[in-house]
Design a protein with these regions (language model features):
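Active-site anion/phosphate-binding pocket segments in diverse small-molecule metabolic enzymes
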Residues: 1-24, 28, 32, 74, ...
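Active-site-proximal beta-alpha core segment in soluble small-molecule metabolic enzymes
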Residues: 10, 14-17, 24, 37-215, ...
Length: 400
């Protein structure tokens, strides 16, 4: 069996097609929104379910100077031999727990987020053991109430970082924070956080900290809050063409295109009489004689059970709705009088060009956010990356 046959057979049941041309175009659009700030492409959680290495490479090709991850393991994978990430691209990680691989991260030339005294002590010890200084971004909690140093503890953290810097153990290259409500335009916490961030940055600089970058803007802030851009912006979900929230607007409003298209092949098509119960609990009963199609994807694949009897699916050009409960491996759609053959394509979501549902449609059906829809697509669904930089038929990239 050759490689093409293997890919074809692996994707017979379902596939998540990842349009790298669209991703590159999105990065360029976001850079245009970024007011001259550098762009960090956030590829945590396997690039929000899209495939971290392929998406990281595509983002860099489109001008991303930084890559961001949550865990150090994710960041180390980007520095592994064969990853294909240029050495001059900065890679930052920020979600640490005590005893983490600080030394490995320092030796891999990663940028390290530090938001508390315990973390500063561990990174300092690791730098001493590694025999080289760490690159550190001090994180301030400006109001999110999650990671980062509380304002009351900021002076102590800054003083300790300056002492370690004077000892040659680290370099404070960044000061940063994260916005709580940037996806709610006009929320009073936004200006309050920006004000506090400016104050905490100014204090650190008065103490002698000379950061290369200051950063607080996430995807919604990149799109709607130019005053938050500072030196570096962090683009996550918007890079994948998914709206941060309905209040922000549709991706197309900002020149963005959805990157992932999720499809499956109908596993079974059959006729049933009226009054026939469908799936667990018989929450759907056929209103009359009809045709049912079995879609071989379920909540084990990340299809949200909360979208039972609500999730939209395009089958042979017609929009259908999940009929009854979504099960672990499969769900059913009522096809009415249509009779597509087994193997016919069911499109769960895509950019919307062919009338198919979008990620936002599924988020609404499940009562959740687009972030969750794409990041939950499971490992049983192969990712097929198309329109890479060397593809002469890269229509999306040529349009940008």
């Amino acid at each position: 069996m050759n490689e093409n046959d293997a890919v074809r057979k692996a994707t017979l049941r379902a596939r998540a097609e990842i349009d790298l041309g669209a991703l590159r175009a999105n990065v360029r659009s976001l850079r245009a929104h970024a007011s001259g700030a550098a762009l960090m492409a956030v590829v945590k959680a396997d690039a929000y379910g899209h495939g971290a290495l392929a998406c990281a490479r595509a983002a860099v090709e489109a001008g991303a100077a930084w890559l961001g991850t949550a865990t150090p393991q994710e960041a180390l994978a980007l520095r592994a031999p064969g990853a294909g990430i240029p050495a001059d691209v900065r890679v930052m990680c920020w979600l640490w727990t005590p005893g983490g691989p600080w030394r490995e991260a320092i030796e891999a030339d990663l940028d390290l987020g530090v938001g508390g005294m315990w973390a500063l002590e561990e990174v300092t010890a690791a730098a001493r053991a590694a025999g080289r200084p760490a690159r550190v971004h001090l994180k301030a909690d400006t109001g999110l109430g999650r990671g980062g140093c509380a304002p009351a503890d900021w002076a102590g953290l800054v003083a300790a970082a300056r002492a370690a810097e004077a000892g040659g153990l680290l370099r404070v290259v960044g000061l940063w924070s994260h916005l709580a409500c940037a996806d709610e335009p006009g929320h009073p916490s936004i200006e309050a956080q920006l004000t506090r961030f400016r104050e905490m940055v100014a204090y650190a600089e008065r103490q002698g900290v000379d950061p290369e970058v200051r950063h607080i803007a996430n995807s919604p802030a990149v799109l709607t809050l130019p005053e938050s851009h500072f030196d570096l912006v962090r683009t996550g979900v918007a890079m994948y063409g998914v709206s941060p929230s309905p209040a922000i607007g549709a991706p197309a409003d900002f020149g963005l295109r959805q990157v992932m298209t999720l499809t499956a092949s109908l596993a079974l098509v059959k006729h049933v009489p009226g009054g026939h119960g469908v799936s667990y609990g018989h929450h759907y009963v056929t209103p009359g004689t009809t045709t049912l199609g079995l879609v071989p994807l379920g909540y084990a694949d990340g299809i949200p059970r909360h979208a039972s009897s609500a999730g939209p699916v395009l089958v042979e050009g017609k929009l259908r709705t999940v009929s009854g409960r979504i099960a672990m491996d499969q769900f059913v759609v009522d096809l009415g009088g249509d009779e597509p053959p087994p193997g016919a394509e069911a499109v769960l979501f895509g950019p919307g060009d062919r009338g198919e549902p979008t990620v936002e449609d599924w988020a609404q059906a499940a009562g959740t956010i687009g972030y969750e829809i794409v990041t939950r697509i499971g490992s049983r669904v192969p990712r097929v990356h198309v329109n890479d930089a060397n593809d002469a038929n890269d229509v999306n990239d040529a349009r940008a």
